[in-house]
Amino acid sequence: MIIRAPIRTKTKSFRGDQMDFKFPSNESLPRGTLEEYHLNNHHLLNDVFAAENGVSRDEDGNSQILSDYTSTSNTNTNSGYSSNGYYSFANISDNTTSSPRIVINQNETARLTSSDSNKSDFFASHDFPGNDSLHYSSSSVVKNQLHSMEAIPEGNITGSISTAFQTIPTADNVSYDIAPSSASSLLPRKSTSKSAILPSTQEAKPMTKLNMEKDIKTIELNNSVVPKPKKKLNRVPTIRRVESSRFSNSRYSSSVSSKSSSSRCSLKRSKAIRCKGGLLYYFTSLGIKIKKKLRKLRLVLRRRLFSYNVQKVPSATNSKTTKSKANINNKSKKRGTNLVNKNSNSTPRLDTKFKANHPQSEDSKVGSNTPRSPLVSYTPSLRRTNSSIRRAASILTASATMTPANNKNSFISVPDNVSHAVTRNSSMYSRSRLVRSKPSTALNAIARQPSIVVENKVIPLSMNRYSIKEEDEYVIDTSSMRELSPVNSVCSSDYDRESSESYSNYADAMETTEVDNKDRVECNNEIQNVNANNEETSNEESYNLMKHYLSTVIAQRIMLRVQIARIQNNKSNVVYMNKSAETNSTIYEDLADSLLTEYEADGSSSQIFDGVSVRADEEEEEDEDDEDDEEEEEENDDEEDEEDEEDDEDDEEEEEKRKEGEGRNLAKEVDELAELSPMRKQSDLSITLRSPFAMLNSAYSNSIISLPTGVVKRSLTLPVGMKI
């Protein structure tokens, strides 16, 4: 049996087995709305860690703020302590210096001395209780009183006396030190330039009684100047590296004076540290000074622009009581509205950097944050990129509240009064069966529990595991399958009435089983007999009707183009613009009138077949519009005969149509039109098509397209215009 165990059981972040620590389950969390403090688990980590080991306050590897870069378990860094991803130095504490030893004096301060030089480091003994064994690491010694990252002077080769402010920070013992909120108030400005900084002596002398007394005095001075650091991190940790300008000038003087003692000192310096001084130090200090000045300017401008008077601004509790009194008494509604407006206008925007000054208790641990000041980690995590966080925290297309409750296939039940909100992934209100995401089509993205990202950690918001119902997306309904009876095409309207009464062409499969086979055979025989009789007549009628229709349309279009061509011709324009004696109007006016009357008519006044029927039956009386149309057609026929003789005056379109032979056969077709007088009586042009989707009881179950001839008009752009 294979037992799964982590490969690396010890990490620096927990100082113990990984399996000892368990994240608190979501069942222990309150069910109400959770703030960011409760969703964040930094304080839980620190409490568990502090309960297991008593740890010094300022040790940086313990906190989870910079866990990716400062932990030695991280394999992606260059050295064990990668100095938080910034400039890394050569680690000279490996093989060049001798191992330090710890001396504990009577006045309860431990001194770290190296045998090679008379260099001594002092650190407070309250960090190491007497009961525990001294877990000494070179980083904890320096960090206890180095509250800001000290820049290393260029030529500083250890003087005989070095205080806590002037040590050699290496990559092992000092990565960037995180200054707490009280770090700015740790060092008073007056005392740093004189008493806190001791000049380094030029000559290294052996330790005498006088030097020992001086050392004790310097220890007392340092302990009096540097107070104990406060224990809480109440704001965003900042990286402080450089002090005031006086301090930097004195640092340079001490570094220059210590060059003479370089021959007597046995400590080796690597070239990687020498590059830290000089221009790099100058520009970093200059940049920090400029930032401080800009922040002061910003504060001054804010105070003047946004009226920073604290006395005028009423507190939150007073405003709440005044609002409640106004609501209860209902006497001073106007005053209440004025107070609300004043509160909203005069309250300044608070900066999170200057907000967090709270009374602090000694029992609180490092890194435990209050709900008012959330910790923000600026180092990007190696395990989490932006895309992975988006992938893990996205609830596909929309949040769980977006799926409607009345949907049968939705696996999340939602109240009905859901506002149709527009979320990042779904612009439309999602009515789909499965909640899908636009970018990914993976199977694991179909349904995922809602989650939130706090400090680059994905925290699920529910313990429910939604099960996906196994349903087919493409449902085949067997009730919609129907057996189709044989399709029969019938053209006569008389038979349509008989067939609709006697036999339903598209009966349901269940209904047709009840009908006997004898009835089916009889119906089929009747249908075949009727079809045989009607096919001959219907074929002849449809042929004659379509021939008559197309010939008249083609003839009228040719006549119209002849008229337009002659009007556009300059030579014959004078003749045709003169008024004719018969109609007392020009040909151009007749053409315009004929066009207008046809388009204004509703299909009754200017019909193609009516004009043809007048030639067959001269006895019928017609309107004036129809007579004008007939006269135009007779004139245009004569003009077309003349046009056949004069080919030079015609357009290209007329020549193409003559090549096809339409102009030659036009006279014959006009003569045949007189023989089609019975066509006028039958006024329906029916194209019969049968489909299985036709309605059973409708009048149009016989044919999809039914065209009465009165609806068909002549068009200038299209060959035929129809209303279906």
UniProtKB/Swiss-Prot annotation:
Residue numbers carrying Phosphoserine: S25
Biased composition, class Basic and acidic residues, residue ranges: 350-365, 656-671
Record key words, sorted: Phosphoprotein
Subcellular localization: Bud neck
Primary localization: other
Acidic residues: compositionally biased ranges: 617-655
Biased composition (Polar residues): 338-349, 366-383
Chain residue ranges for the region called Disordered: 55-77, 314-383, 602-674
Biased composition (Low complexity): 315-330
Lineage: superkingdom: Eukaryota
Any one cellular-component term (Gene Ontology): cellular bud neck
Family: Belongs to the AIM44 family.
Protein name (database record): Altered inheritance of mitochondria protein 44
Lineage: Eukaryota, Fungi, Dikarya, Ascomycota, Saccharomycotina
